[in-house]
């Protein structure tokens, strides 16, 4: 008998979150393996089965970056150490960016590019 894996429906998105996801999707159209997943209380964009960013309900952005670049990227406007719940800091390589700091496409592109750089490095490492 064939068994199908049950998948939960994705959580509903806020209008702000949906708009941010559309903007992110437009920045990764050149990638062949892109999908959305509900993760970290938001909607994550996965490239090559690895999260690059997750859009929060308030249109803030959780970004996965190279841990070696973490401190330098924290100096960017609107960037903060990511937390999973009150006071539970995530490790190096996880940054939250405020919605105000990614209001224009150039700023959003900066963060998606940073995440894609890490994604490409990790994907290459896993292929070797």
Segments (PLM) and residue ranges:
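Charge-dense, helix-prone N-terminal extensions
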Residues: 1-128
């Amino acid at each position: 008998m064939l068994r199908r894996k049950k998948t939960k429906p994705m959580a509903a998105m806020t209008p702000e979150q949906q708009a941010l996801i559309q903007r992110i999707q437009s920045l990764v159209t050149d990638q062949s393996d892109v999908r959305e997943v509900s993760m970290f209380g938001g909607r994550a964009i996965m490239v090559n089965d690895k999260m690059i960013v997750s859009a929060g309900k308030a249109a803030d952005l959780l970004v996965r970056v190279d841990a070696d670049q973490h401190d330098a990227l924290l100096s960017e406007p609107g960037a903060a150490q990511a937390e999973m719940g009150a006071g539970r800091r995530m490790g190096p390589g996880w940054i939250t960016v405020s919605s105000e700091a990614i209001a224009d496409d150039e700023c959003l592109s900066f963060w998606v590019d940073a995440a894609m750089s890490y994604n490409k490095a990790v994907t290459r490492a896993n292929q070797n």
